[in-house]
Design a protein with these regions (language model features):
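Alpha-helical/coil-rich non-catalytic "connector" segments in signaling and regulatory proteins
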Residues: 1-146
Length: 146
């Protein structure tokens, strides 16, 4: 599923707004992770969608934020979902600038949006897709034989 499909078809993203990186909404979402630490180079994966309330990013100055976004681009992170109103009510302009410059979609959701709901709504279709592939492979193996 792409970010665009996720935003249009998923009720858990009701009230979401794309505020930067609009040109990259065709990226495929392969997994989802809550951003708790800025050492993304140690755990980030291509196609990962990051959920955050800005907690891990608030300690970064502009230069370290730039490095964080460079690492996100290198890894292939598909986007960031930021819960506004929990820790911050306004996004620092340099964050939006980096998202646009490094082509990383920045999506805001209301503070009432629950991480659990977003994570489940992303992982359920991904798991169904994986199970379908596994079932297809099993049928093929059954037909071909061992």
């Amino acid at each position: 599923m792409t970010l665009n499909q996720l935003l249009k078809q998923n009720q858990s993203f009701y009230g979401a707004s794309v505020i930067a990186g609009e040109d990259c909404l065709d990226r495929e979402v392969k997994s989802v992770m809550v951003l708790e630490a800025a050492d993304i180079e140690n755990w980030g994966k291509p196609g990962q969608l990051l959920l955050t309330s800005f907690y891990a990013l608030q300690i970064l100055d502009a230069e370290n934020s730039r490095k964080f976004f460079i690492n996100m681009q290198k890894i292939g992170i598909c986007g960031i979902v930021l819960k506004l109103g929990r820790l911050i009510s306004d996004i620092p302009p340099y964050i939006m600038d980096y998202c646009n410059y490094y082509h990383i979609p920045l999506i805001t959701v209301p503070k009432t949006t629950q991480y659990e709901t977003m994570i489940l709504s992303i992982m359920e279709p991904l798991m169904r897709q994986m199970l379908r592939k596994q079932s297809t492979m099993q049928r093929y193996n059954d037909l071909v034989g061992d």
